[in-house]
Design a protein with these regions (language model features):
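Structured, contiguous alpha/beta core segments that scaffold functional sites
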Residues: 1-247, 254, 273, 357, ...
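Long amphipathic alpha-helical segments
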Residues: 135-163, 222-304, 308, 312-341, ...
Length: 370
């Protein structure tokens, strides 16, 4: 008889930066949760902010890692493409995408290399709402996990990945890319809300019905009630209905004499402030401003320098992941991260060159036909 061996279940991976749900209380929150909620609300309420961060994530590009040993490089490339990330994704690019968005939105990002079987078995993006960053001397930072109303230091800090965006001198807290935008965004949302209210009123017109009674004033109340009932019947009727009244009656649309304020100028002023802070060219966000076409190449160059700076923040994170995996696999931990070239300026030039070539070809065909 054939004997079937029971398949061994994989051991659960322990993530040290994730607090136990049973011990997690609402009161145990790290410093700055209100600020993080504000930045999340900004991304949810102002689509252009969320779109800009998504554009930066996609424009960041991909990278390759080179190692001295060919076998080590092949295995490392396979690991980077297939490593489990959080609960639903695979590949180091997925981990870096969440890590980068967290860094831009909150100013800090925390990740973890999860060990299993003596190897880096998974990568995990830690939520900043469940941890607290504390300085550990002038050159180090410590991470603690909130469990209820107490903090538990992470026992293996060498497996953690930490980054800060433009921290102030002597501080481990980074600066969010959205810092300074709440005030501007509040004004923009007020304008949009007012526009919605005004258009709702224009689409659902309210009327003022005025009836001047006889000088004697006899039966004025009865006539007013009867007129109100007839007007209500005429307005609520599903079919075309007439309103018949006797006497001096005037009907006016409420607000017909008012003029809706022009919102184009203030909305553009607020959007200019937001775009300037985010560093993304307006034409990438669907804003067709007159200066965009003339300055697209210069703006592409500026975005390239921004992306290079962001890559500089992520390169040490990638190197730490790769070196840890190589060391645990028994290989030389030396490796080098090489990003693909950001040539947005060249892409613009190439697009113009293709257009000119197509135009020249079209003219040549016309000359041949004649």
């Amino acid at each position: 008889m054939l004997k079937f061996r029971r398949k061994e279940e994989k051991a659960a991976l322990s993530v040290q930066t994730r607090p136990e749900e049973s011990f997690r209380l609402a009161g145990g929150a790290p410093s700055g949760p209100g600020e993080r909620r504000l930045y999340r609300a900004l991304r949810e309420s102002v689509p252009i902010i969320d779109a800009a961060i998504g554009k930066l994530r996609r424009l960041l590009g991909e990278f390759t890692v080179s190692c001295p040993q060919a076998q080590a490089q092949r295995e490392l490339e396979e690991f980077l493409q297939s490593v489990p990330v959080n609960a639903m994704e695979h590949g180091v690019q997925a981990f870096l995408g969440v890590y980068f968005e967290q860094l831009l939105t909150y100013g800090n990002a925390v990740g973890e290399m999860v060990l299993g079987g003596g190897q880096v078995a998974a990568l995990y993006n830690a939520s900043l709402d469940g941890i607290e960053l504390e300085p550990k001397g002038p050159l180090e930072a410590a991470v603690s996990v909130w469990e209820g109303d107490r903090k538990r230091p992470c026992p293996y800090p060498e497996l953690l990945l930490l980054s800060a965006l433009a921290p102030e001198a002597g501080s481990i807290r980074g600066t969010s890319l959205l810092r300074g935008l709440p005030f501007v965004s509040e004004i923009l949302l007020k304008i949009y809300k007012t526009l919605g209210v005004n258009w709702d009123r224009l689409g659902n017109v309210r009327f003022a019905v005025t009836c001047k009674p006889d000088p004697s004033g006899l039966y004025a109340g009865d006539r007013a009630r009867q007129m109100a009932e007839e007007w209500r019947r005429a307005m609520h009727s599903r079919e075309v209905s007439d309103f018949v009244a006797v006497g001096d009656v005037s009907i006016k649309a409420i607000g017909a004499d008012n003029q809706i304020l022009d919102s184009e100028v203030p909305v553009r002023q607020m959007l200019e402030q937001i775009v300037a802070k985010l560093g993304v060219p307006p034409f990438l966000l669907g804003l067709s401003w007159s200066s965009t076409e003339r300055m697209s190449s210069q703006q592409a160059d500026m975005l390239t320098s921004e992306l290079d700076a962001y890559r500089g923040l992520l390169t040490p994170v990638i190197q730490k992941i790769c070196r840890t995996w190589l060391a645990l696999a028994g290989y030389d931990p030396q490796c080098r991260v090489e990003w693909e070239q950001i040539t947005m300026q060249d892409e613009v030039d190439h697009a113009n060159a293709r257009y000119l070539n197509a135009r020249a070809r079209q003219l040549e065909l016309k000359e041949e036909e004649t």
